[in-house]
Amino acid sequence: MGRYFVEFAYDGTDYHGWQIQPNGNSVQEELQKALSMILRVEISVVGAGRTDTGVHARRMTAHFEIDRNIDCEQLAYKLNRLLPRDITVYSVYPVADDMHARFSATLRTYHYYIHTSKNPFLRKYSCEMHYDLDFNLMNEAASYLLTVKDFGSFCKAHSDVKTTLCDVSEAVWVRDGENAWHFRISANRFLRNMVRAVVGTLIEVGRHRLTLEQFREVVASGNRSSAGESMPGNALFLEDVKY
């Protein structure tokens, strides 16, 4: 069996996340259907992560196996002809049999976008915030995350994870324009709902509703209910996956 990686992007607006759902369309299902139709054999794909409903990916990776050689360039071309317009394949290429889209990934990067003034052209992919936010304080709080190992406070309740340990290597708010910012965070792995919960809690810091000391206490508590609200999914992008 030969193993192949597919690198692609998608607009998650009309999907119930990456993973196949019993009642709702998913990106995984669309990719599997297209591959199976083109290759004329039942194909299963494994993704680098599981984005939630409405979340987007600028660069996602998935792998599949097939027992014959394929023309990767031609397959990528055919996939782009067959897939919906909100999914784009960048490339298909062979990898070693032990390469795994999820478990071989060493770094994942997410961006969360916000804007602080009404803008009809940002509303679909950015969260509108009507607060006067202290981004310097938010970046002080964000930098503390680089010293944290247990992110249980930002894990969706009742998630079936074996560990809540993550190694965050970057967490910073970046200005994109006069009234636009994004939060960039990179780690070896992420918990379910983690990025949106982190952003929601940092917003509380930016509104001066949490002090830096209280933010550290929230992180240390391991209690999801003590952290901020989960932010909307439409402003979250999986930016990149490294191997």
Where are these regions (language model features)?
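Structured-RNA-binding interfaces characteristic of tRNA pseudouridine synthases
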Residues: 1-243
